A protein has these predicted regions:
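Extended, low-polarity transmembrane helix blocks
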Residues: 1-32, 61-66, 70-151
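Membrane-interface interhelical connector segments
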Residues: 34-56
Length: 151
């Protein structure tokens, strides 16, 4: 197998794995929130924070749920359009990864508000992993030229 072909197959496999990972993460969390609604513990955990006043606990929960479902939708679009195959630029995948960064900021902010610093640290790691995935996805131009070294 030619090195160029091997590199193309490897990149496609990595893009597919990134796409499937985030599809799974946001699918389970976002759709789970839509189906289950606001859990009973949500008020206990966040009721003493300013989120109880603004935007309100119910609104905060649904904003987060919609954010996660939006990330799931972008991941699904990236998969359905076959961006991992390399026939087109991974635009939906990039957008989903950038959106995911903001979702992790939302999640981390909530944990920080409740002084749950272990969970905040975990979310920081998820944020960092997402940033690494984004750098990898943006690592080549549409013509295949390497761009990571230019960052």
């Amino acid at each position: 197998m030619k090195p160029e072909r091997f590199a193309s197959i490897s990149r496609s496999g990595a893009l597919l794995a990134i796409n499937l990972l985030f599809l799974m993460v946001w699918g389970f969390t976002g759709i789970g929130k839509l189906l289950a609604g606001v859990p009973p513990w949500f008020g206990d955990k966040f009721g003493a924070t300013f989120m109880a006043k603004f935007p309100g606990l119910t609104a905060a929960f649904w904003i987060l749920a919609i954010s996660e479902v939006a990330a799931f939708g972008l991941a699904a679009l990236a998969l359905v359009t076959g961006e991992f195959a390399g026939r087109r630029a991974p635009q939906f995948l990039r957008l989903m990864l950038v959106w995911s960064l903001f979702v992790f900021v939302q999640l981390g902010f909530g944990q920080w508000l409740t002084s749950d610093y272990n969970a905040t640290a975990q979310l920081f790691a998820y944020f960092a992993g997402t940033l690494v995935a984004l750098i990898y996805v943006e690592g080549r131009t549409e013509s295949g030229e390497q761009t990571v070294s230019k960052i």
